[in-house]
Structure formats: C-alpha cells, structure tokens
C-alpha cells in the first residue's frame, strides 16, 4: 500500500468519513511496508487493501461484515467474501453463500465468485481486518485495522439514512451495539463457513430479508443477481 493522502486512496465521501483515522491508515501503510521489507508478504495486493472504500459512501444501503481476507494467495481482492473472476474452486464460505443465494432468490449459480456487482449497487463488503499474511488466518488481527473499520461502520451508522447490516457469525455479531446507535436494521445468522453453515446459515434467507427491510424503510431494494 503506497504512502499517499487518504483522498487519493479512497472515494471522496469515504475520505471525509475516515478523516478521524487518517493517521491510523498511514500507520497501517507503514506496517505493511515494513512487513514487505522484512520478507513477509500480505494479502490482498496493495492496490486492493482499501478497495471496499472506493465505492460511494453515500450510496451504501447494506453492510456485510467479514472477519479478515482469505489467506490463500490469489483469493483476496479487498471485498469481504469476494474472489477474482478466475478463481476455481471457490472458497467454501462463498460456495455456501451461493447455495443460499440460489435457494433464497431462485437465481442460477453465479458464473464466478466476483461480488463486485454487489459493491457497485450499494452493498459494502467490509472485512474488520483488511490484510492477512498468506497462509496464516487472523495474522493481522490486533495490528490496528480494527480502529479504521470501526470508524467506517460508525460513519455509516451516523448518516441520516437507513442501513441494513448482515452479521454472519459471532465475530460480526459483536458489532450489534455499535449498529444500534443509528437507523440500522440487522440480520444475524451463523457464519457461512463449512463449520457452521448447517447450524442456521442455510435457510436464513438473508438476501430477501435485506430487501424486505429496505422496502419497509422506503429504500430501493438491492438487485442481487450476479452474472
């Protein structure tokens, strides 16, 4: 991640929203450069670390919270749960998300694991920790990203517009008190990982429930359909 001003790294609205943690973002950039200098790689690639913040802040209607990026090289792309279009096989969590997507909405299985269309339509795909060491899950937890992503979530909640947050798993559920501070509805279920998907993620209908909550608030529903 290059050392550049925040407004050159993220969308204009996000640059304003993240201004309180601009110094922390800079410190995390320095942390990543030190990692590289000492021979330790990180994921996703530098230009994708802040990718979730390159879509318009004012257009976010839905927040889907992940934990940290996929640790498998070639998988992480800076949007929670998403992968590059050419990734095969899909990560198991994403495969389970697509199983629920087809059951909930009746759409066919998507042709790839690229969730960029959701991000372009107002769904923020945010990991609480934005980087990871390859092959080592959770390796960058507690390094400083949490302050940045917490600021981002608080900024979304503080807007004078409705938000629906999708909380998959116990880690994401800890955000519920923060989300309760504003006009934010929440949808909770177990995580889509193979360890927990059968304990309540399957059958939870998150996509149609999000749209029901948006429409109840007079907000345009999300077009979830993927190519």
Curated annotation (Swiss-Prot):
The active site is at 68 (proton acceptor). PROSITE patterns: U_DNA_GLYCOSYLASE. One of its GO terms (biological process) is base-excision repair, AP site formation via deaminated base removal. It catalyses: Hydrolyzes single-stranded DNA or mismatched double-stranded DNA and polynucleotides, releasing free uracil. Its EC number is 3.2.2.27. GO terms for cellular component: cytoplasm. InterPro entries: UDG_fam1, Ura-DNA_Glyclase_AS, Uracil-DNA_glycosylase-like, Uracil-DNA_glycosylase-like_sf. SMART domains: UDG, UreE_C. GO terms for molecular function: uracil DNA N-glycosylase activity. It is found in: Cytoplasm. Keywords: Cytoplasm, DNA damage, DNA repair, Hydrolase. It holds the Pfam family UDG. Belongs to the uracil-DNA glycosylase (UDG) superfamily. UNG family. Excises uracil residues from the DNA which can arise as a result of misincorporation of dUMP residues by DNA polymerase or due to deamination of cytosine. HAMAP family: UDG (MF_00148). NCBIfam families: PRK05254.1-1, PRK05254.1-5, ung. This is Uracil-DNA glycosylase. It comes from Mycolicibacterium smegmatis (strain ATCC 700084 / mc(2)155) (Mycobacterium smegmatis). The lineage of its organism: Bacteria, Bacillati, Actinomycetota, Actinomycetes, Mycobacteriales.
